[in-house]
């Protein structure tokens, strides 16, 4: 049984022998069912308060205070439910729903709120509860609702409702007992809308919250050797949003809110069936037929045949079961609907509005893509985590409950048959004609022709059940939000602007670009590549694509000469690596294709960012040297070759400007690049190593400067060229030696991407190499961001849901169920504490003591004492639910009686079972109403429901049920053609009408027939309470 709060049952003082049932009194007010505590950790089961002497019961032969004097005490209200202990331990099995009255379908209650959104976009809104189907058939006995323990059985009038004995919390239902299948989730048949009066159609449920998206898997860690780590597993899908609680059936007791379908939280407790809906009264009798024309004199009009009584409307379909309740939350059982009074006759019931259709729950949003794996030690980016599993779509809203059928107008009672009309006096004989023929006899007064008896107004057929609410349209699946575009990586391009610093590029000319190939050694700066880890920023590297602007970057290339490498230190830009988070946008990075743009060369590193798109893996594509294309630019690098004038390499200091080539700074991002592990991707840079260019690299020092030279051609850098004079910075070019850091040159490996450029080898080497450093940034970036995603890995938290597995504990409870046997002792329950002793066990047999057994609840401690106490687990004894079955036994009888109501009181006796309840083992006792005998004690768990058997006193409510029953009878009965014929009777007045007399018969008969229906009366529902 899903975890649900248990209702706290107060212990009841020993119950004296049951007195003879008192005369039925008006049904005692049914105690309110204790509110269900919020699910909390199941608190320790507080001692169960002793059950006070049972209050006088309601009509059901009120149980005597102690039963000794036989005076039924007033039925005590059900004690407040203790707060639900944390942990939402499953409540004791709810009372077994009594067979719901065939009432109108309850309106669907509003949908429960959707679960909170989880960190990863927690559960989506619960799917709307579908409208409840058309009025349910006479509800079968509701499955044992997985309601929390029924509120204390007021029947025994909790002695001063023993407050909740220590809040039993959800009876601190041990763990979530595994759903012992507390009677199976059958209880899930949601709350069976008691078919009480047809409630107004509930609003259609709100669309359920879409299930949470699964968290994206964590990115795999890169392998030690730099192999991309395995991608993180996809995050578990977020739990689906809980479906909104099922709407309450109309006036029928509100069903517990169906919890969202959670991990299969307990289903809301079954709402008590509402009182039988009023049977739609027959429609008003048909108009009386106009009196027939006088027939031939003397002929009496034949009495009209009574109109057929309207057939009762078809029984509505059974309401759909409510969706499974949220875990732990059992909906409070709805109060039993009051049986509808018989509608005044003659008024046709309006047809109830059709229930709104539930909306379909939104689709769960797609899980976030897994973060890119962290780069391995070799710097290779780990594989991106798998995208989180897409959250489950919210359930499709259930069909809205059928609009309540309008009560059929009560059938108008047939007016009493009109007095038979005096036969029209025969006209005086006509004067004899001249021929002496007697004048024609005066025509008899026209017999008022009995109009055809007014057809009994068709019994107001119940309106056809209101059409089922159209099935809620499925709400459009919440459109999956398109993944936010990966935020564009902060345009590193801006850095590219730095490229304009490139003007230093002219100095770049200095760098013979070919030497740039040396830049390949710059790959050393590739160490910056380490910065490359900043590369995560590189995710922004996508922006790096803008880095294409980077081409000015090439001016940066000037700087690129290892200068950039220092910039790699600039890796602070790696902070941009933070931008890298935008790299999430990096998904675009998937556009990794863009990474291609990265090919634009420096941006190519951005291309790495494109890798970002890959979420790392793509980053690898970035390695693809999207920069490679940049490599093509590399040919421009060849221009760098022009740079071979590299001697201007002195301008290399301008290369420092190359530093300006913030792109290099991007390299700084590289600093961020710790992620730069990707920088290792730069290994691709190794390709750069391929960098035959590497050899150039030697030239590199100059070349480095020179490389920018290529950009220098852009000439814009030319101005920067002035910085060229900085050529002393060319010394910085030595920094280019830092380029030697080029080990990061591995970054240069990223240059490999450049390698793609290899075709442009000259450029490839040079520019790409340069790009490579940026690439470092880029690649890094991708990982960085994704690494962040790694956070989602948290989703694993859902694992917490695992506790639900705790419910599995219920199974444990099951064993306590056996303890329930001890529950017999539970009967001894008062001693229940002693319950372990079970000494009173024999008394438990006494049953009445069994009530004492309620103390047996204290017996729960007994449960503890006895395994029964374990019975708390016994609560889990939900297995005891089986006990509920027992309950049904107990409740059943009371239930039926429940209709009688008073017998329901006997249901109170059910309490003996209650003792079963007591020992939660006692609850088993319930089963044991037999459990009173204790043996059933196990079932006694169920017995708690047995307490509900006490609730059977609610059977009084059952009495209410009877009214419902009458409703049906009355309704049709009235219709019993009487009314119909009545009108004809009047017509009959013309003597001939007298014949109409026949109508009378039909009238009464009509009535009688309908009563048959009463059988369905919900009172058993009351017994449900009892249950």
UniProtKB/Swiss-Prot annotation:
InterPro entries: Collagen, Collagen_superfamily. Residues 168-182, 227-249, 398-420, 447-480, 527-543, 635-644, 698-710, 828-848, 884-894, 911-927, 942-962, 983-1001 have a biased composition (Low complexity). It is found in: Secreted, Extracellular space, Extracellular matrix. Signal peptide: none annotated. Keywords: Collagen, Extracellular matrix, Glycoprotein, Hydroxylation, Repeat, Secreted. The modification 5-hydroxylysine is found at residues 96, 108, 183, 192, 261, 279, 342, 351, 546, 567, 573, 612, 657, 738, 765, 810, 927, 933, 936, 939. Residues 63-72, 380-396, 437-446, 575-599, 750-771 have a biased composition (Basic and acidic residues). One of its GO terms (cellular component) is extracellular matrix. The modification 3-hydroxyproline is found at residues 53, 161, 164, 416, 551, 647, 773, 815, 1010, 1013, 1016, 1019. The record marks 610 as: Imperfection in the GAA repeat. Homotetramer. This is Fibril-forming collagen alpha chain. It comes from Riftia pachyptila (Vent tube worm).
């Amino acid at each position: 049984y899903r975890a649900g709060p248990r209702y706290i049952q107060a212990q009841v003082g020993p119950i004296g022998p049951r007195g003879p049932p008192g005369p039925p009194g008006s049904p005692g007010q049914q105690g309110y069912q204790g509110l269900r505590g919020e699910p909390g950790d199941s608190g320790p089961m507080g001692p169960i308060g002793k059950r006070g002497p049972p209050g006088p019961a309601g009509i059901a032969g009120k149980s005597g205070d102690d039963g000794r004097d036989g005076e039924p005490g007033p039925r005590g209200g059900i004690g407040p439910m203790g707060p639900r202990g944390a942990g939402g331990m499953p409540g004791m099995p709810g009372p077994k729903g009594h067979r719901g009255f065939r009432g109108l379908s309850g309106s669907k209650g509003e949908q429960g709120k959707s679960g909170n959104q989880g960190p990863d976009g927690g559960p989506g809104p619960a799917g709307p509860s579908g409208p409840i189907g058309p009025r349910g058939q006479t509800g079968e006995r509701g499955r044992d609702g997985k309601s929390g323990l029924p509120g204390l059985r007021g029947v025994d009038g909790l002695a001063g409702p023993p407050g909740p004995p220590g809040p039993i919390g959800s009876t601190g239902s041990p763990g979530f007992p595994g759903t012992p299948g507390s009677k199976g989730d059958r209880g899930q048949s949601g709350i069976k809308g008691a078919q009480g009066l047809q409630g107004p159609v509930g609003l259609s449920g709100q669309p359920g919250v879409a299930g949470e998206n699964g968290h994206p898997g964590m990115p795999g860690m890169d392998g030690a050797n730099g192999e991309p780590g395995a991608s993180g597993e996809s995050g578990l899908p977020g739990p689906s949003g809980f479906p909104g609680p099922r709407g309450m059936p109309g006036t029928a007791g509100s069903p517990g809110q169906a919890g969202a379908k959670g991990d299969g939280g307990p289903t809301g407790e079954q709402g008590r069936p509402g009182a039988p809906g009023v049977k739609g009264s027959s429609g008003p009798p048909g108009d009386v037929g106009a009196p027939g024309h006088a027939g031939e004199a003397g002929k009496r009009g034949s009495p009209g045949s009574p109109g057929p009584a309207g057939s009762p409307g078809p029984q509505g379909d059974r309401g759909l079961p409510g969706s499974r309740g949220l875990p732990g939350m059992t909906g409070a059982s709805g109060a039993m609907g009051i049986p509808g009074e018989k509608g005044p006759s003659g008024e046709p019931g309006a047809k109830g509005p059709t229930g709104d259709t539930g909306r379909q729950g939104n689709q769960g949003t797609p899980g976030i893509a897994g973060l890119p794996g962290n780069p391995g030690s070799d710097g290779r980016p780990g594989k991106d985590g798998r995208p989180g599993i897409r959250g489950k779509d919210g359930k499709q809203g259930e069909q809205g409950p059928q609009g309540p059928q309008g009560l059929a107008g009560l059938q108008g009672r047939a007016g009493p048959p009109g007095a038979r009309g005096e036969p029209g006096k025969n006209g005086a004989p006509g004067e004899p004609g001249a021929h002496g023929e007697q004048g024609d006899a005066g025509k008899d007064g026209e017999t008022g022709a009995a109009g055809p008896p007014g057809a009994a107004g068709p019994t107001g057929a119940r309106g056809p059940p209101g059409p089922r609410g159209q099935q809620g349209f499925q709400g459009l699946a919440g459109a999956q939000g398109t993944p936010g575009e990966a935020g564009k990586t902060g345009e590193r391009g801006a850095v590219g602007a730095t490229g304009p610093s490139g003007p230093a590029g002219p100095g770049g000319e200095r760098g013979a670009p070919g030497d740039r190939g040396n830049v390949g050694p710059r790959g050393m700066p590739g160490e910056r590549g380490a910065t490359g880890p900043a590369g995560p920023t590189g995710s922004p590297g996508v922006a790096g694509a803008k880095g294409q602007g980077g081409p000015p970057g090439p001016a940066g290339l000037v700087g690129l000469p290892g200068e950039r490498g220092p910039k790699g230190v600039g890796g602070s830009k790696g902070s941009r690596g933070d931008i890298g988070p935008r790299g999430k946008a990096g998904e675009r990075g998937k556009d990794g294709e863009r990474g291609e743009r990265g090919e634009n060369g420096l941006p190519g590193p951005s291309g790495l960012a494109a890798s970002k798109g890959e979420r790392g893996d793509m980053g690898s594509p970035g390695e693809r040297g999207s920069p490679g294309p940049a490599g093509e630019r590399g040919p421009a690098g060849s221009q760098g070759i022009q740079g071979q004038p590299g001697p201007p390499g002195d301008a290399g200091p301008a290369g420092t400007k190359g530093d300006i080539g913030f792109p290099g700074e991007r390299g700084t991002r590289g600093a961020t690049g710790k992620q730069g592990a990707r920088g290792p991707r730069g290994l691709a840079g190794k390709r750069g190593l391929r960098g035959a260019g590497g050899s150039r690299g030697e030239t590199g020092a100059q070349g480095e400067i020179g490389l920018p030279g290529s950009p220098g051609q852009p000439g814009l850098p030319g101005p920067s060229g002035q910085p060229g004079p900085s050529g002393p910075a060319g010394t910085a070019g030595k920094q280019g030696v830092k380029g030697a850091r080029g080990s990061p040159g591995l970054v240069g490996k990223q240059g490999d991407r450049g390698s793609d450029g290899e075709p442009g080898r000259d450029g490839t080497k040079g520019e790409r190499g340069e790009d490579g450093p940026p690439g470092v940034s880029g690649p890094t970036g991708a990982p960085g961001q994704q690494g962040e995603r790694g956070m989602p890995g948290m989703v694993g938290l859902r694992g917490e849901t695992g506790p639900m597995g705790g419910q599995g504990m219920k199974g444990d409870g099951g064993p306590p169920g056996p303890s329930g046997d001890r529950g017999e002792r539970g009967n001894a329950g008062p001693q229940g504490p002693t319950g372990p002793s079970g000494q009173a066990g024999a008394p438990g047999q006494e049953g009445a003591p069994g009530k004492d057994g309620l103390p047996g609840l204290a017996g729960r401690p007994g449960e503890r004492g006895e395994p029964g106490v374990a019975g708390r687990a016994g609560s889990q004894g939900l297995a005891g639910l089986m006990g509920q079955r027992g309950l049904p036994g107990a409740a059943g009888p009371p239930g039926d009686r429940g209709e009688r109501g008073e017998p329901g009181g006997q249901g109170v006796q059910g309490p003996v079972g209650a003792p079963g309840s007591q020992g939660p083992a006692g609850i088993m006792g319930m089963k044991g109403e037999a459990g009173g005998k204790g043996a059933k004690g196990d079932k006694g768990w169920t017995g708690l429901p047995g307490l509900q058997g006490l609730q059977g006193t609610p059977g009084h409510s059952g009495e209410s049920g009877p009214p419902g029953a009458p409703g049906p009878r009355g309704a049709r009965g009235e219709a019993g053609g009487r009314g119909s014929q009545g009108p004809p009777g009047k017509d009959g007045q013309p003597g001939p009408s007298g014949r109409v007399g026949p109508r009378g018969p039909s009238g009464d008969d009509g009535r009688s027939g309908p009563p048959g229906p009463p059988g369905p009366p919900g009172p058993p529902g009351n017994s449900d309470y009892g249950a």
